[in-house]
């Protein structure tokens, strides 16, 4: 995926695998956890969360990221391990999340 972060969306893409691994470890993510990820961007954190066995509900506003993430995580989406929502997390009604448990 070759697109740069949109500062208007407040984007900052994660790149350092060590940082992402440390984040997942610090959050004590274990298999069976359900994680809400705001702005998965390029899917770096998403990938680590899925590898840890978590189910991920990823809410992405950027139109450019949706096709990329849909293709990158096609198998996880088909298996129900990843739910990719095209929405603005700041306007998303958290009550709608209950349908994904």
Language-model segment annotations:
Residues 1-101:
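Catalytic cores of RNA-modifying enzymes
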């Amino acid at each position: 995926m070759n697109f740069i972060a949109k500062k208007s969306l407040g984007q900052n893409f994660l790149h350092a695998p060590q940082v992402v691994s440390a984040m997942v470890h610090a959050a004590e993510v274990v298999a069976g956890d359900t994680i809400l990820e705001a702005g998965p961007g390029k899917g770096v954190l998403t990938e680590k969360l899925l590898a840890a066995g978590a189910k991920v509900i990823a809410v992405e506003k950027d139109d450019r990221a949706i096709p990329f993430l849909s293709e990158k995580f096609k198998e996880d989406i088909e298996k129900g391990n990843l739910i990719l929502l095209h929405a603005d997390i700041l306007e998303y009604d958290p009550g709608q999340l209950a349908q994904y448990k």
